[in-house]
Design a protein with these regions (language model features):
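Extracytoplasmic beta-strand-rich oligomerization domains located immediately C-terminal to a leader/signal peptide
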Residues: 4-132, 144, 159, 170, ...
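Short linear sequence signals and composition-biased patches located at protein termini or domain-edge surfaces
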Residues: 124-220
């Protein structure tokens, strides 16, 4: 009976690990595809758009909102009259765990209207969409045409925005369940003002990465 019980526990544990790793991989890769699509659109301006000054294309904010993660903001036209602002950043739940969200605002300069609301016209109960439920870290780096890191890329400096050639995005995803027998310390070494931080627990973590050529920003 003991042997059968042990075999069941081992099988169940192995199955859970396989399932969790598959969920982590799917979450990390699908979110990177979404972010990459927005990054490729960053800075796109319709030739007939004249509603506001074209001075914002891409921005990074270090250690956003009390987390160690970055905030990425992207702007581009979706029509001759409309522009959207898309933000990616970490939020904390009531347990203090972080998750990655995507927020979309239509015409952020002239008449800002958030998407994903219970009622769009009255902006009732608007909230960003969660794209990764268990995200430990979210980091963004901008590089110039020579591969050098760029700092202070924000809407207060169009000069720095125009220098961005590629963007690197790193997302660290945590397993939904505790899968390790003993706690392991994970150390995150981040740039900017975030610095390094550690997590010590029984969860698995995996970091997913993508580098994107900003085809529209390069043309500006």
């Amino acid at each position: 009976i003991a042997a059968i019980s042990y075999s069941y526990i081992y099988f169940n544990s192995s199955y859970q690990k396989i399932m969790d790793k598959a969920k982590m991989s799917k979450a990390g890769r699908s979110s990177l595809q979404t972010i990459a699509k927005d990054l490729r659109n960053a800075g796109y301006k319709n030739i007939n758009y004249t509603r506001s000054t074209w001075d914002r294309w891409i921005e990074k904010i270090d250690a956003h909102n009390g987390t160690k993660g970055d905030k990425l903001r992207i702007w581009y036209n979706i029509s001759t009259q409309d522009r959207i602002e898309i933000s990616y950043y970490l939020e904390k739940n009531t347990s203090g765990e972080t998750y990655l969200v995507r927020e979309v605002i239509e015409n952020p300069v002239i008449n800002p209207m958030k998407r994903n609301c219970e009622r769009f016209d009255t902006q009732k109960n608007c909230a960003p969409i969660t794209i990764i439920e268990n995200a430990t870290d979210f980091q963004v780096f901008f590089n110039d045409k020579d591969g050098n890191r760029l700092n202070n890329v924000n809407i207060s400096s169009t000069e720095n925005q125009s220098k961005v050639h590629t963007a690197e995005v790193y997302i660290t995803v945590r397993s939904p369940n505790e899968l390790l027998k003993n706690p392991i310390t994970f150390e995150m070494l981040n740039g900017g003002i975030a610095g390094q931080f550690t997590k010590s627990d029984k969860y698995l973590r995996e970091t997913f990465y993508i580098s994107v050529y900003l085809r529209n920003v390069v043309k500006i």
